[in-house]
Amino acid sequence: MKSYLKALVFAVLFLFILGFVYPTVTSLITEHALPFQSEGQPVEIDGHIYGSYLLAEAFNSSFFFHPRPSAIDYNLSESGSYDYSLGNPAMLNLTEKYLHRFLSENPGVNISEIPYAMISYSGSGLDPGIPLQGAIIQIPRISIAIHNITNLSVSDLYSYLYNLVNSTKTQNFPFFGSYYVNVVRLNVDIVEFLLKGGYISQSQI
């Protein structure tokens, strides 16, 4: 009887420690040490929350950097993708569809310049990261689009965007990894640039 009681006490104790104390303590430490990360890295512009730097959205405007294709149309409630193999005809058809869409959105880009990630969906369907090259080849289209609403020099806009992209690049693995950029972060910088210049209003975001 005593052994059963001892086992029950230990079970309740461990349940309390591992189910309540440990999660609570780690949560409090994280909230104070890394408040931005612990809150999901929210996108805040002029006091309003518009999303998260961790989640891609369907940035359809021509003056935005476009993310990777999404099998779920960037639906936050349905994270995931198709389970097609690379040789599956359906996968090949989707890749061809994404390729034609990218080329139509970015005239002048050569097929050989397009990273495969830009014409294939991510595993979650919400990945905000794209290859550095995938961002750079979008700059001409974005420069012209911003010029059309600001009348600023296309060459100056290209330089601004090129520097912006390269200043935010990160490696997916230290030292030897490929360079990626976060499209949400880039697009937030564009929005803030346009807001600051008075080219768009808060209601247009």
Curated annotation (Swiss-Prot):
Cellular-component GO terms for this entry: plasma membrane
Keywords per UniProt: ATP-binding, Cell membrane, Ion transport, Membrane, Nucleotide-binding, Potassium, Potassium transport, Transmembrane, Transmembrane helix, Transport
Transmembrane segments: 9-29
Family matches, as Pfam families: KdpC (PF02669)
Listed GO MF terms: ATP binding; P-type potassium transmembrane transporter activity
Compartmental location: Cell membrane
Signal peptide: none
Membrane topology label: Single-pass membrane protein
Family stated for the protein in its record: Belongs to the KdpC family.
Role played: Part of the high-affinity ATP-driven potassium transport (or Kdp) system, which catalyzes the hydrolysis of ATP coupled with the electrogenic transport of potassium into the cytoplasm. This subunit acts as a catalytic chaperone that increases the ATP-binding affinity of the ATP-hydrolyzing subunit KdpB by the formation of a transient KdpB/KdpC/ATP ternary complex.
The protein, known as: Potassium-transporting ATPase KdpC subunit
